[in-house]
């Protein structure tokens, strides 16, 4: 039995609340158990310099944690004057994942910036960020369509992400902080609605994992992501 009494293959309670803030073209509060992330999508009717004149758009992401989103207060990165390597890695992951769901040619010369701000962290902040941000991105693209700034829907399909891990040689789905801190291996998996992989990040913390264990973790991740895609579709009213 797990720390929070879940089954090995059970997600934490997942909530996706759209239109959470007033001004952003897309805004979502996503909750994976006690992990809560505010994801906003903002439209800029221009593109970075390296894309000017190419007739395509761009999707990028930023990620941050509120100072008291964790058990003890962490300094704001702005106060330190630079982002940590972890922050840079996570926001690049979010950006890569979200670009996989968009036909950038159909987006026109528009940029959508995703901001993922962790309000409360209990493991899986990057996977929750991707899952919530995907919904916010859909809403932002629908704004562009409604305003007739683009002619075709750029959406190729939803994406979602989940963590899995090995703990005492058993595969666990959707790790909370305590599980993540004590597991032998943890994997972060990002997949498309079509069941294709975008990213697999895996690290053996305690002891190496076998090919069979890797396959078992990926199968568990596929199951969890399929459930998350359904949650996204429900939130979008599809």
Swiss-Prot record:
Name listed for the protein in its UniProt record: Ribonuclease PH
Q: Which reaction does it catalyse?
A: tRNA(n+1) + phosphate = tRNA(n) + a ribonucleoside 5'-diphosphate
Q: Which InterPro entries match?
A: ExoRNase_PH_dom1, ExoRNase_PH_dom2, ExoRNase_PH_dom2_sf, PNPase/RNase_PH_dom_sf, Ribosomal_Su5_D2-typ_SF, RNase_PH, RNase_PH_bac-type, RNase_PH_CS
Briefly state the protein's biological role. Phosphorolytic 3'-5' exoribonuclease that plays an important role in tRNA 3'-end maturation. Removes nucleotide residues following the 3'-CCA terminus of tRNAs; can also add nucleotides to the ends of RNA molecules by using nucleoside diphosphates as substrates, but this may not be physiologically important. Probably plays a role in initiation of 16S rRNA degradation (leading to ribosome degradation) during starvation.
Q: Name one GO biological process term.
A: tRNA processing
- HAMAP family in alphabetical order: RNase_PH
Pfam families xrefs: RNase_PH (PF01138), RNase_PH_C (PF03725)
Which CDD domains does UniProt cross-reference here?
RNase_PH_bact
What's the EC number here?
2.7.7.56
PANTHER family from the entry? EXOSOME COMPLEX COMPONENT, EXOSOME COMPLEX COMPONENT RRP41
Instruction: Print the organism lineage.
Output: Bacteria, Pseudomonadati, Pseudomonadota, Gammaproteobacteria, Moraxellales
Q: Where does phosphate bind?
A: 86, 124-126
> Which keywords accompany this UniProt record?
Nucleotidyltransferase, RNA-binding, rRNA processing, Transferase, tRNA processing, tRNA-binding
Instruction: Tell whether Secreted is among the UniProt keywords.
Output: no
**What do we know about how this protein assembles, alone or with others?**
Homohexameric ring arranged as a trimer of dimers.
Q: Which family does it belong to?
A: Belongs to the RNase PH family.
What's a Gene Ontology MF term here?
3'-5'-RNA exonuclease activity
Superkingdom to which the source organism belongs? Bacteria
Q: Extract the PROSITE patterns matched here.
A: RIBONUCLEASE_PH
């Amino acid at each position: 039995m797990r720390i929070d009494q879940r089954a090995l293959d059970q997600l934490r309670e997942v909530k996706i609340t759209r239109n959470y803030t007033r001004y952003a073209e897309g805004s979502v509060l996503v909750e994976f158990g006690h992990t809560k992330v505010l994801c906003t999508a903002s439209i800029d009717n221009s593109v970075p310099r390296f894309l000017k004149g190419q007739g395509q758009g761009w999707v990028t992401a930023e990620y941050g944690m509120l100072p008291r989103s964790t058990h003890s207060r962490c300094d704001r990165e702005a106060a330190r004057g630079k982002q940590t390597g972890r922050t840079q890695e996570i926001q690049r992951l979010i950006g890569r994942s979200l670009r996989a769901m968009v036909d950038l040619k159909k987006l026109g010369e528009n940029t959508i910036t995703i901001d993922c701000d962790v309000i409360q962290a209990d493991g899986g902040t990057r996977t929750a960020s991707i899952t919530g941000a995907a919904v916010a991105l859909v809403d932002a693209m629908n704004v562009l369509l409604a305003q007739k700034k683009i002619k075709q829907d750029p959406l190729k399909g939803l994406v979602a992400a989940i963590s899995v891990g090995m703990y005492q040689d058993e595969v666990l789905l959707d790790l909370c902080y305590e599980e993540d801190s004590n597991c032998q291996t943890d994997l972060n998996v990002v997949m498309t609605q079509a069941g294709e992989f975008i990213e697999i990040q895996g690290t053996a913390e305690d002891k190496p994992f076998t090919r069979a264990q890797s396959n078992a973790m990926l199968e568990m991740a596929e199951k969890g992501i399929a459930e998350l895609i359904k949650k996204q579709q429900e939130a979008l009213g599809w």
